Every structure is written in C-alpha cells, then in structure tokens.
Amino acid sequence: MEGKVFLGHNLIWVMLLMGQLHGYKSCIDEEKIALFELRKHMISRTESESVLPTWTNDTTSDCCRWKGVACNRVSGRVTEISFGGLSLKDNSLLNLSLLHPFEDVRSLNLSSSRCSGLFDDVEGYKSLRKLRKLEILDLASNKFNNSIFHFLSAATSLTTLFLRSNNMDGSFPAKELRDLTNLELLDLSRNRFNGSIPIQELSSLRKLKALDLSGNEFSGSMELQGKFCTDLLFSIQSGICELNNMQELDLSQNKLVGHLPSCLTSLTGLRVLDLSSNKLTGTVPSSLGSLQSLEYLSLFDNDFEGSFSFGSLANLSNLMVLKLCSKSSSLQVLSESSWKPKFQLSVIALRSCNMEKVPHFLLHQKDLRHVDLSDNNISGKLPSWLLANNTKLKVLLLQNNLFTSFQIPKSAHNLLFLDVSANDFNHLFPENIGWIFPHLRYLNTSKNNFQENLPSSLGNMNGIQYMDLSRNSFHGNLPRSFVNGCYSMAILKLSHNKLSGEIFPESTNFTNILGLFMDNNLFTGKIGQGLRSLINLELLDMSNNNLTGVIPSWIGELPSLTALLISDNFLKGDIPMSLFNKSSLQLLDLSANSLSGVIPPQHDSRNGVVLLLQDNKLSGTIPDTLLANVEILDLRNNRFSGKIPEFINIQNISILLLRGNNFTGQIPHQLCGLSNIQLLDLSNNRLNGTIPSCLSNTSFGFGKECTSYDYDFGISFPSDVFNGFSLHQDFSSNKNGGIYFKSLLTLDPLSMDYKAATQTKIEFATKHRYDAYMGGNLKLLFGMDLSENELSGEIPVEFGGLLELRALNLSHNNLSGVIPKSISSMEKMESFDLSFNRLQGRIPSQLTELTSLSVFKVSHNNLSGVIPQGRQFNTFDAESYFGNRLLCGQPTNRSCNNNSYEEADNGVEADESIIDMVSFYLSFAAAYVTILIGILASLSFDSPWSRFWFYKVDAFIKKVRNLLL
C-alpha cells in the first residue's frame, strides 16, 4: 500500500512538470524582430557578435534565452531588457519607438551604454507612456542632459529610476518628476545639479523610499526654515519631513550648510542617512537617537562642533554603520566607560574626533568588519583586543595618532588592511607580524620610529599587494624570505630608512611589482641583476644611496618602465642608449652622479618626458631634436659647450634649465617659440650678444590655467581583493526584502585604488637663493634667469608684457641703457635683479606699482637720481643700491639737495645717456695723457729733483738684477 502511495506522489510530480513544460512559451516573433532592430541601432555591426554572441537569427533561437533578455514564462513576452555595460555606439540617440513592441517590459537597463539622448518622431515627449508596465529604468553612467526629464515625465508607472553619473546640471527640474507618483527609488547622484534642493516639489512623491542626490553641487541651509517660508525652496518641514515612507536618504558630497534639522526625527522609518562630505555645522543632535530603525548613519567630513556622546545612540538597536568626522578641531567625542550599547556595529569610523582613548563601548562589539580611528590623539598600546574580539575584522585604520606600543594579537588573524602610520612607536617592529597577519593585502607602518632589521616573517605575507615601511630607522639587508615570499607585491616603499647591502643582486619573486621605492637608504654596490626579472615594473626609485659602477644597459629594456630615478649616487660612465630609445619612459632622473659622455642624438619617447641630468660631467653639444618630446630638461652644472642649439618642436617644453655650462654664442631666436615655458635658466654660461626682444612672446603662464602643468608621476592599480561587501547581502537575515542601494551599503574603503607617486623637484634661483619647488608650488612659479653671462645692449622694453613672471634675473652682464618703465606692468613680479651691469638713468618711479616685489637689486650700476619710495620700495635696504654713486635718498645716507645727484629723467633717450658717457671717457683719457706728458717734461730738465729720481730708478734696477743672478 505504501508503495502505491509513493508511486502516486511521483506521478503527480511528473504530471505537474509536464504541465509546466507545456505551458512555457518561447518569445514571440514580433518582439524577436524588434530586439534585432534595437541591437542594430545601438551596437555597431563589427561589435555585435562579440558583445551579444547568443543573439542568433535562426528559427530555432529563442530570444527569451538570449543574454540580457528575460520573458514571462506563460505569455512569452519580454519583461526585461538589459544592454547595461555593453559597447554601444558612441553618442548614440535612442529612438524610443524601438521599445514600443515590448508591451509587457517591466525592467529596462541601458546603463553605461554611452547614450546621449532620446527621441521619438511620432510620440515625442509622450513616448514612454506606451510602456505601461515599465517599473525599473536604469540610465546611469551615460551622457544624458536635462532634456531627458521631458520624456521621463510620461513614464508614470516607474517605481525605480537610476540617472546617476550623467551630464545633468543647473537647477534640479523637480516639476518634471512630480507626476511619477509611484516612484519608490530615485538615484540622481554624481551629476552637476546646483542651487537649493527643491524638496517641496519632491514631497508629492509620497511613496518615495530611497533618494540619492549625492555627488552634486547642491547648496543652501539644512536648518528648519518654517512651514510658511514660501520663498525658500529648501523648506524642510513642508518637504523632506513629509516623506514619511523614506527609508534611505543620501545627500552626501554636496555643499549643504547649517545645522541638522530637528524634524528629521519624524522620518521614523529611516534606515540609511548619509550626510557626509558637506559643510554642516553646529552640534550633532542627540535627537538622532530617536530614529530607532536606523542602520546606517554617516556624518563624515563635516564641520560639527561641541561634544557628542555615544549614549545618545543607546536606542538604535539596529545600527550597523556609524561614521563621524569633523574638519573642525572643536568636535569632542565622549566615551562613557559604563555604557553597553544595544547594537552590534559592522563599521565604525571616528576620524578627527579629538579622542584621547579608544571608545570603551567597542569592548562589547563582536561583529566589526571595518574600524577607522585615525587622526585622533589616542596614545598607549595598540588595541589588539579589537582584533581578538572581532574575528571578521578586515580593515583597521589607526594612522595619525600617538600610539607608542605596537602590540599585536598572539594568534593569527584574517585582517586584510592595516594602517598604523604616523604614530610614536618607539620599540622594535614585531618579529612575528607575518605569521599573525598572513592574509594582509595592505600594510602601512610608515613615519614611525621602528628600528632593527626587517623581520623575515614578512615573507609569509604572500598575498600582500601594498607595503609602506618608509620613514623609519630599519637597517640591515633585505631578508631573502621577504623578496621571495611576497610574490603578489605591487607597490613597495622602503624609502628613508638605513637599509644597506646590494639592491637585488639575485633574482626575486617580485614579478608583479609596479612601483619600487628604495631611495634615501644606504644601499651600496652595483645595480643588481635581480631587477631584470621585474617585467611589470613601472616606477623605480633608487636615488640618494651609495650605488657605484655604471648604469646597466638592460635597465632600459624593462618593458613597462615609466619612471627611473637614480640621482645622488656615485654612478659613472655613459648613459645607456636604451634609456633614450624607450618609448614608455616619462621620467628619467640621473642627476648628481659622475656620469660622463654625450647625450645620444635621438629620444624616441612618444609622451612628454622629464629629463633630469644636472650635476654630472656630461659634455659635448645638445642634440637639436632633444626637446621634441621633452617637457622638463635640466642640464645644469655639466660640461656642455658650443652654441645652444636651434631646437625644433619646442612647443612642449615647460622647464628648460641650462645653467652652469660652457655655452657660447647668442641666445637663439628659436627660444622665442617656447609657447608653454614656465622656467628658463640660461645663467652662468658665456652667452653674448643682445637679449632677443621676442622672448616677450614666450608664455610664462600667461593665458594658461595654473593646473595645466602636472609634473608628479604616479601609478595606481585597482584592487579587487576586498570586493567591498554589501551589508544588504551580509546581513539579510534581519531585512524584509530591500530596496537598498549597494552604493550606500557597500564598504567602499575596502575596494580601493592603491596609489604611489613621486614628485618632480626643480631648483630655481629666486630672491637670491636656490630653492627646491615641487607640487603646487612648482606650478605657480614662472621665472627667467639670464644672469652671469656676457650679454650686452638694452633690456627689451617688450619684457613688460611678461605679466605672469614672478622672477627675472639679468644680473652680472654688460647691459646698458635705462630700466624700462614697462617693467611696472609685471604686477606679479616678486624678485627682480639687475645688479652688476652698466645701466644708467633713474630708477622709474612706476616700479612702486609692483606690490608683490620682495627682492629688488640694482647694485653696481651707473644709476642716478632719487630712489623711489612707497609700497614695497620702503622695505628695501641700502644693499640693493650699492655701487651707484649718483643715487640719493632713502635707504642710502646721501642727501638729494646737492645738484650733483640731479639727472635727466628717464624720458631722455638712452642714446643721449650714451653720448654723455662717451664724453666722460674722452675727457678722462685726455686728462690722463696731459698729466703723463707733464711728468715726462719735468724729468727732461737737469735739476736736483730729476737727478734724485734717476738715481732711485738705477738703484732699483741693480737690486732686481742681483736677485735674478
């Protein structure tokens, strides 16, 4: 009997299965044809097969089984279409009429499809009303502008609308959305909307549960303005606080100001509140503790002040994510020692909160995944109990505190991300760190006082990708287990330590490394052969060590090398030709060595290059093709000779430094074509002739954005080792379904880009000293130095057009004539040196208009007249005017009452001054000859005085003869 029952049950299941199979219908032909038509208009023919390989046009092909298509199993009609992320035609306009055959479509995904607009020649703006069942529309990451809202207003059935990362700007067009009364989720993040947020208009969307306006430029106050304040769009009480169904609200990364409105507490169903990266002020209201449904609270990166107590969050039993950070230094986070919270956090970030100890309530947290307590004043031992209590902890950020003891757990942990940089650790680095944290992907212990050798246990971190041990006092050789065991390493920073030995004399397992920083150590010997195996290496910095020998030719054969820095060593010999024929190389710094030989005649790079070869023993001439691809060329203090070449293709060069060589001849007129020049230094050579007036045509920043120059080189790589886990996925047991944004509930710090960079440092003389400039300071420096040459003639009047120039040095030449009044137009000038020349006439009083001038030198010229006073000229001392006997007034001690100091105004032409000087020289010569003739005539007479004179001469001659014999 039991067997029959069992058989009956099986027959029933078989019959049900057959019924289901019989009820399944393939897609209908009309929609199949429409899908092919849609593909033809959106995907190029050459890409369609590779993008959608399952889309075949044979009779047996069921379009319901195609990639990106889903159908109703009973009717066979298409319900979902997804072209998201496919390679669509660039700037394509979508013809909405192509969608009309899909009457039952509920979800349409065209995200990341490069669409730029919609159109329908028949239905116009009302086209989307044809799709009566459309509920989900994803148009994120395209190129749509505000005109799309005219079409969207007809899609009244929509419940979910994604428009993030498009080209929308200006005022937010809320009126076009007010008819979408079924909307539950609206994502307009990462656009360029500005002005006030029109919450009053959005209040008609009564069903709205999730609103994301993050990453825009919205401004205005979030303070309660009052229900009857009709002239303010951002009326919180009559707007956002009436959205009673709101569960997620993200207004982060905008420019909102003011205090948090107290009426937010009326949104009792709120589960996600993100107001981070705004300019909110005031105290953090304790009333947030009444939002008992809250799971995600981020007030990160604002300007909150006053004190904040965790006790105010006592009733938030569902809280899992808490982020608080203030750019203001007056926020004080209090920690109650006896308080035990009801919640179990997964993420806590309390950055820049002026905390002096780890919050006590964290002792009761057992499910933490991410802890950020950086930028505080916490001292004492590293809280290893956080790791012991939270076995799922993946990220621990404790940088920029005052920890003194690096205490780690006694047993192994699964931590992935550890940053303890910039603390006060004053003892040895943990020997067993590699055994305790074998799964680390990111480790930063830089800017501490760690000493002794690097522990060999580091080699156990075979998954480590980023390691920064720089700016400590580590010494000794690199452990062999370390260079062989960390085979996943991508970026390694060992800079500014006391490490010694040879650099990779043998092969290593760092085959995946992209950036290797070993500068400012005590490494010795030759450049090791082990570097040859680093085939993915992009950036190599070995500067400021004690390396000897020659630069091996194979180093230029590393296939991915982009930046090579070996400055400040003891290298000698020629520069390998391979470095000048490497197309990928963008930064080559071989300065401050003993390299000799010549620069190869060709540079094969296709990109802008920074070439730093100063302070060597290089000789010969400069190839005239060298500047074709170079942006920065520094050849200072070498032994180059000959003429400065008539460079070709010089439009890319922005910094040209040739100081301290043996260049002769005139300044080539080709340099007048330096359309992007920022710094020009030709000083301390033997250049002669006049200064080309056409140098005034060079840019020196005029008409350029200050950000147009970027001399910092870096590398970055995306890491997917963390993947960022979604709270909705990891904690779904206490959710009722969910409409959560993954962008809100994904732990974004876990999926990060690793970055490493080196800043180009340039030395330039301003204000009578050499300073090194880099980063933002370098971008703002515009200067020309032609000093210490043999230049003659006058200062070009046209130089007054160099309006952006900050520093001009023409000292130690043979310049004559007057100081041009046009110099007064150079309003940004800070340093102006004309000393040790032959300039004449008065100092133009118009120069007092140079309000930025801090250094002015005209000493040792032939200037005359009254020294101008006022503004910056009141700050210059007498040293600025030494060697000009005809100058008077302050700050010299010479009175101007004597007529001998009077001189014709600078309105007198320069050639008139020259005539005066010629007359002076002729008069001086005539007087000298007259005196000499008078002496000789007196000696011709026979007198006691003449006999005495001849006696003395004979005695002197006899004495000299005796000394020689």
From Swiss-Prot:
Write out the transmembrane intervals: 917-937
List the glycosylation sites. 57, 95, 109, 145, 194, 315, 377, 389, 444, 509, 546, 581, 652, 662, 688, 697, 809, 814, 862, 893, 898
Please give, as recorded in its UniProt entry, the membrane topology of this protein: Single-pass type I membrane protein
- List the GO terms this entry assigns under cellular component, sorted alphabetically: plasma membrane
**SMART domains in the record:** LRR_SD22, LRR_TYP
Q: Which SUPFAM superfamilies did the record assign? A: L domain-like (SSF52058), RNI-like (SSF52047)
Against Pfam families, the record matches this protein to:
LRR_1 (PF00560), LRR_8 (PF13855), LRRNT_2 (PF08263)
Which PANTHER family does this chain map to? RECEPTOR-LIKE PROTEIN 14, RECEPTOR-LIKE PROTEIN 15
State the similarity comment.
Answer: Belongs to the RLP family.
What is this protein called in UniProt? Receptor-like protein 15
Task: Give the species this sequence originates from.
Answer: Arabidopsis thaliana (Mouse-ear cress)
